Amino acid sequence: MNSSVYLNRIASFLPNSPVSNDEMELYLGLVNGKASRVKPIILRQNGIKTRYYALTKDQQITHTNVDLAKHAIDGLGLSEDKLNNIQFLSCGTSMPDQYMPSHAAMVHGAVFNNPVA
């Protein structure tokens, strides 16, 4: 058994345009109709200046979790032959689009043109 593993390429995908801290609540909404009182404190402490949301300002989803993974995999620029030679695909998320079928099964279906649902 060959136990060596090599990372040959990496890719990422971020949806839509970056959203500034000032625009956050336009995407996420207000708390009881009011701006968050702790937002400035948290943002000052975490240092994040922009972020990406997979939704519009009226909270319409633009990309699913599976879409994000599929776009990142597409970004690897693999030929169909190399893609078909993948022997193991590991996926993880803290917030799946759905529980069944699993996130990994859904990504596998999207990547290998064999949708699960």
Annotate the PLM regions.
Residues 87-94:
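Short glycine-rich or small-residue beta-strand-to-loop segments that form or flank ligand, phosphate
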Residues 45-53, 61-63, 94-117:
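Conserved catalytic cysteine-centered active-site region
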Residues 1-87:
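Conserved active-site "lid/cap" helical segment
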